[in-house]
């Protein structure tokens, strides 16, 4: 009998689990009843009986006697009631666990269906279909990303090369501009220095010539004032003084220039002597004559300096100064 009870319980539980998964709760109860009847645990009315023993049941029924021809309702109490409750609880727990496991599996299947399960092939196909619809202008190779990384790297490298080349060109341009500015500044400094040096040199030379001219004029006046000297002697003294002064200043006269100057001085001295004798104020006449003679000597001796002054005034005058005056006829 114990084997029949255990077999009936197992059959009922299995049938109940199957009914919960595939047919609902009503079908599960029907299957459990069929299992109990096959195990001999029912009396045909759906109640569990113990070999049709109605002794205890009759005592419990009391005055509630069933109608004729109908079996009394079976009720369990005591140990049998506890055994029935235990069987029902065990079956319910097993059935609930089976249903929970089945529902978890269904839930996971639903999630996999909605957002993609663990099938990499299916997910890859879905991704390719999506990319093909979203980017129809790309070919499969580009949508797969096979050439994207290389293209990005090449584009980045080209941009970097362009930026580096631009920086190099900008640096070269800046360096060239700096060099040009420096060269212009150096050239300007050199030009200004050269002009200033030339101007200073010419001015210094001019001042020296003017000093020499004044000194020569004083000496000529002294010679002319000496009445003890003849015209020839006076001419000789004046020429000797003029040639000495020319050598001191680095000016050299040719023989023809010396001869021409000597003739002019001789004629001028003769004229001075005649005018002095006829003049009331001899000293003033001597001074004027000395200046004329000195100018003649200066014209011949300082020709080179006058040429430099003329060149300066013609080519180097900046428009802000008066230039350098000539040495003649001071």
From Swiss-Prot:
One of its GO terms (biological process) is symbiont entry into host cell. One of its GO terms (cellular component) is viral capsid. The keyword Nucleotide-binding does not apply. Keywords: Capsid protein, Viral genome ejection through host cell envelope, Viral penetration into host cytoplasm, Virion, Virus entry into host cell. It holds the Pfam family Microvir_H. Residues 57-79 are annotated as: Disordered. The keyword Ribonucleoprotein does not apply. Minor spike component of the viral shell. Involved in the ejection of the phage DNA in the host and is injected with the DNA in the periplasmic space of the host. Involved in the determination of the phage host-range. This is Minor spike protein. It comes from Escherichia phage alpha3 (Bacteriophage alpha-3).
